[in-house]
Amino acid sequence: MPTQAAEGWFGNNKSAVLGTYEDKRRINLMNENFSYKMKLTDEEKEILHGSKGEVMAKVMKTLVLYGDAFGAERFVPVNGKGHLVTSFGISVLKPVFSIMDELIKGGLKVDEGFTVDPRPIDYANVKCNPLQKLIFNKILYGMQDSYEVQLNKLGLKSDKSFTCACYFDEVGNTPKKGDILSWAESSAVVFANSVLGARCNRNSGIIELFGSILGKVPEFDLLTDEGRKAKWIIEVKTTKIPEAQVLGSAIGMKVMEDVPYVKGLDKWIGTELTDDA
């Protein structure tokens, strides 16, 4: 996302929570020449034109553009808790922090709460000398504290919600089969789809936050019955358990964006989730 996008996101940086007449007029002008292919409900059209404020209108507009790009025809409700991939307070993410500030000023948050990927450094378990801590805290991740304030204002579940594996019981963000999710973390998306039977596309960072705030996501690809059908059958015939990274890379390079069905791993890892898996 270009840095200048942070200045007003799509232009004007004024926030409207309730939507005065002038707010709605400005939003209507902003979206006057905005054409899209998705079929929106009357309520969704009203949101796009400012019924829930200018910032929510921008969220809706972004998701409509996202849906159009992938051929989605409609929105579907999100019924699982959110999970964010962006967890580092690193300076190159300043545009992200500015967008989050705008969401907060607009009074928006994730009502159901969300989890987020791990913090950059685990000082309790990874020992660092004073110089290393200084570099990490002041230079590399100098915006971590202020970013976590933003996360809390937007609906972070708790201080224990930093993990890539949000689906574990102790974290409390375990989707059910058939749940529609708005996630971006690649490993969690794969686990949710393949193990838990939930439905989630590999969204990009911030897009997944927008979907959780709106409570809806564009319906395409892995959210549809057709999009979940495997186009490849991959049979693993190696004499010993393959390295996960090598196997995943080999399959990915072959199938690209298609859905594979992988056979032959159960003789090593079984069919149940255990520590050995």
Language model regions located:
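Non-transmembrane, aqueous-exposed alpha-helical and coiled segments at domain scale
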Residues: 13, 17-277
